[in-house]
Amino acid sequence: MTASQDAPVPPAMGPKIAIIGAGPAGCMLARLLQRANVSVTVFESEASLDFRSQGGTLDLHTSTGLLAMKEAGLWDEFLEHARYDGQYIAWVEQHARQHFVMGASGARSDVQERPEIDRAQLRRILAASLPEGMIKWDHRLRRVEAPNTLVFDTLMTSDFDLVVGAEGAWSKVRKFMKPDVDPTYTGIGLYELSIPNASATAPELYTLVNRGSVFGHADGKRLSIQQMGDGSLNIYTSSLKDEADWMRPEKCGHDTSDLAAAKEALMEEYRDWDSTITDAILKASGACKTRSLYMLPVGFRWEHHRGVTVIGDAAHLMGPFAGEGVNVALEDAMRLAASIIAAAKNTENGKETLDQQVEAFEKEMFPRMEKVQRLTDELMHDYFHTPGVPQSIMARVLTRHVKFSTPAILHPLATLGVHSYMFLNSLASRWR
């Protein structure tokens, strides 16, 4: 049964849940709770679903993001937009020489799959699955006051048994729980560009990307090109920047919202790169966006607060370098939903059981998210702080990914397997 065919449910039971943020994590949590007949309200600061651009493409993984979509009863809707041929990934150096390629399967696998979907489309699927009125748009949370009072621009309420912060990097819910910790600047800033209708406007790049992604690397720099569902290419240029406000005209020397000026600056910054890759800058059109990347400390955690918790980026903000952010966020939603639903079934001591369940969820989440944070932090240092990338790091990067996905007892074998593969791949490349 698809989202649009879900049968009507009786009046909601148990605790009343407030979710702050209608991103993928917040909407997934709301969807799972709504299906279990738990009372839930989502508050979103944006005025509408399409209020702003929602970023690039995401790959969902078998045991986390994809499992959550199945648990939410949204598998058919997901398959309508999933790009299994988008699993192609190539790592190249600045002269466009390939150092590692993962080919697209073009088909589903029951063992391991990482299909792509646009972030905006994923959010649209999740939001559309919720009953009309469940998301309260244009509700910007200003602060949380003790015990668990939500203060919005035009509303103040204490009408919830649990408040879940899923509102991203600058979470007000997290600030209430842990006021002395803010995200820190990673030292990396990026431009986001786009090439619409790439098959016609940039056919060489369209062929290069092969409906997937190409990641170009040189010392302290990265240029990524990713296929989007609408046929456009998303371009990200990432490099080391001294200060988080590097995009101010007085610091970077140009207006970063001016595409022509940004192109000129980027072509100068990437002047030593092959034109096969930098054509992605020249062919871009439309809006030019900039931002700085932030992260929470690896191993970040908090003392349990009754009636409030956080998930997703609000709990474990990290860079995009491991490709795990949205997957672990959807896993958070799936696990927290199970905890809340279990508490809702206890009609005699529901609030106490809810608190115990949420605290147990947090204790499970802390080591799980630390593992992902550590992988992301290590990969960020590999990519941006190691000479001779990508050639100098490919074996290390692949080993990190394999170790992340395998039990510790298999790590020596995994390391040997990766290095053997890289050696054979190197020999084969000499004969091409």
What are these regions (language model features)?
Residues T2-I17, A22, L32-A36, D59-A198, ...:
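Conserved N-terminal helical subregion
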Residues S45-L49, G55-L58, G65:
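Glycine-rich active-site loop/strand segments that organize a redox cofactor
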Residues F100-R114, D118-R119, T157, P196-K289:
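Conserved FAD/dinucleotide-binding core of flavoprotein oxidoreductases
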Residues W170-S171, L190-E192, G220-S224, A315-H316:
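Histidine-centered metal-chelating micro-motifs
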